[in-house]
């Protein structure tokens, strides 16, 4: 019995000692030190490197966290290296190289912040293992940053690429080959290349859908530095590389019946002056309407139902022409739905709209009525804003309650279906319930400027200016706004993206340095320098 007790005590002691070696004693000081690399085989910055396996030893147990996103190998390898262990703690990291290495090349295995100690997760920041297959280690550096071209969205894990400008370079290389050097912003917007070779380079940034370091214009965002990078002259890029999505070349996709009397035509890219014309013979009573769907590459085509089993259309734009057939099947007509864009409060400067899902062919103003809280009739007009949108126009009085009613058959759509009785109630607020933002815009560019007021990234109001002037955004609901200025270099009143092959940078967008936290009955004045 005593022998058994002695064995248990010894085993318990061994377990306690073992645990003590991996963790800190209860009540001891917290370990705040990052792991330290003790040795590497082959050694760090080895030249004439010709091995397939690398073993790195640390002063404590480490784990690898987020390695798939943190690890950047430059130049990139065709076959990713096998790095172990992952998921368990160890004092060693093993790297197995599966690819054939280039001659006379400096390689960098940048682990980012993936190497952390096992107990307190202290990060060994920007840990690298470097070697060269040639006679020396390249040592030049390049730093910079990236930014979105149009929005203020936060960027991270942006791939930054360097292509050597030699006799083999063509612009098409970015669509086919991996770069000569690779970096990443990881969790920030900054990047740094190290161990670069002297020479001239193209500098690119990619926000990729897949991490293959090859540009896919359909899925990826791209940014490029407008000038040639020359090393060792260039070490710091002062202005951020701006990322944008290219507009795709026009490509018609297909036409499909989605409900009875409605076809959707899908396309890709910039539609230009795309025309869709019916070429089938149809009855004299046939009517059709078409409209592009907002923020989608879709044209909706509504028509009075016919007994035919298909319709033929001619599709054309500047560089494309074709004829297609759309099969018609036994589908149901979309019932008429009518919505008011005003919930309960109608802003004093806004218009009351009624929107429908189907095109409106007839509206009868005599079936509309607008009254105030005392049922006093309010003079108004009804105008067709778009094929499926009516504007109710009237002079709004502050702090007033209104009722809008539409009797049956007040609105009739393309399928000759009409509304039931509709009733809407809403009110206006006092002028004091709103605020104003007044900007003294000092324009230091020769181009016109599009001034936009934004609420959570959505455009609330727009002003187009050609010279320095006072821009007033008034009668605004109390909330937080941002303001941006778009330098409209081609004077088409919209923001234009860039294109790599034509070396066109996106139009410059400048956000005012701070948000406007507007309160009721406030007037906020600022100076905005646009250059």
Predicted regions and their residues:
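Sec-dependent bacterial lipoprotein signal peptides
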Residues: 1-19
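Short, composition-biased linear "edge" segments at structural boundaries
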Residues: 225-233, 505-513
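Acidic, glycine-anchored loop motifs typical of Ca2+
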Residues: 208-217, 488-497
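Alpha-helical transmembrane segments and their immediate juxtamembrane flanks
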Residues: 235-258, 438, 515-531
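Acidic, low-complexity Ser/Thr/Gly/Pro-rich repeat segments typical of extracellular/periplasmic
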Residues: 3-4, 19-206, 218-224, 231, ...
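Calcium-regulated, polybasic anionic-phospholipid
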Residues: 446-452
């Amino acid at each position: 019995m005593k022998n058994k007790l002695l064995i248990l005590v010894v085993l318990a002691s061994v377990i306690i000692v073992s645990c003590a070696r991996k963790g800190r004693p209860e009540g001891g000081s917290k370990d705040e030190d990052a792991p330290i690399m003790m040795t590497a085989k082959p050694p760090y910055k080895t030249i004439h490197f010709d091995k397939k396996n690398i073993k790195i030893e640390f002063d404590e147990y480490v784990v690898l966290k987020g390695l798939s996103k943190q690890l950047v190998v430059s130049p990139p390898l065709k076959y990713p290296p096998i790095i172990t262990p992952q998921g368990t703690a160890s004092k060693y990291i093993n790297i197995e190289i599966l690819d054939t290495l280039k001659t006379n090349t400096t390689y960098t295995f940048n682990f980012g912040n993936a190497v952390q100690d096992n107990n307190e997760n202290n990060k060994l920041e920007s840990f690298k293992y470097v070697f060269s297959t040639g006679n020396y280690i390249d040592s030049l550096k390049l730093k910079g940053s990236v930014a979105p071209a149009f929005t203020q969205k936060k960027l991270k894990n942006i791939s930054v690429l360097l292509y050597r400008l030699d006799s083999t370079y063509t612009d098409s290389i970015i669509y086919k080959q991996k770069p000569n050097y690779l970096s990443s912003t990881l969790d920030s917007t900054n990047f740094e290349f190290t161990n670069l070779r002297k020479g001239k380079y193209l500098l690119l940034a990619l926000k990729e859908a897949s991490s293959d370091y090859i540009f896919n214009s359909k899925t990826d965002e791209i940014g490029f530095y407008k000038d040639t990078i020359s090393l060792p002259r260039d070490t710091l890029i002062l202005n951020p590389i701006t990322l944008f999505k290219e507009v795709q070349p026009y490509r018609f996709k297909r036409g499909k019946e989605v409900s009875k009397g409605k076809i959707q035509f899908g396309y890709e890219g910039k539609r230009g002056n795309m025309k869709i014309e019916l070429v089938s013979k149809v009855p004299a009573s046939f009517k059709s309407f078409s409209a592009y769907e907002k923020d989608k590459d879709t044209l909706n085509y509504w028509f009075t139902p016919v007994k035919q089993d298909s319709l033929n259309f001619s599709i054309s734009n500047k560089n494309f022409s074709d004829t297609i057939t759309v099969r018609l099947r036994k589908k149901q007509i979309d019932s008429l739905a009518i919505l008011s864009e005003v919930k309960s409060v109608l802003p004093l400067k806004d218009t009351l709209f009624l929107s429908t899902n189907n095109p409106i062919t007839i509206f009868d103003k005599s079936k509309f009525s607008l009254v105030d809280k005392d049922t006093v009739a309010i003079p108004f007009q009804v105008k067709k804003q778009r094929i499926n949108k009516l504007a109710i126009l009237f002079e709004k009085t502050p702090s007033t309650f209104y009722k809008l009613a539409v009797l049956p058959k007040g609105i009739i759509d393309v399928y000759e279906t009409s509304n039931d009785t509709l009733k809407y109630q809403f009110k206006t607020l006092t002028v004091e319930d709103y605020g104003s933002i007044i900007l003294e815009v000092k324009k230091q560019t020769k181009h016109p400027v599009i001034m936009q007021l934004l609420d959570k990234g959505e455009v609330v109001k727009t002003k187009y200016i050609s010279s320095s002037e006072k821009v007033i955004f008034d009668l605004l609901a109390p909330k937080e706004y941002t303001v941006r200025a778009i330098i409209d270099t081609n004077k088409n009143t919209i923001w234009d993206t860039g294109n790599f092959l034509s070396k066109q940078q996106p139009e410059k967008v400048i956000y005012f340095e701070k948000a406007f936290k507007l309160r009721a009955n406030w007037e906020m004045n600022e100076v905005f320098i646009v250059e």
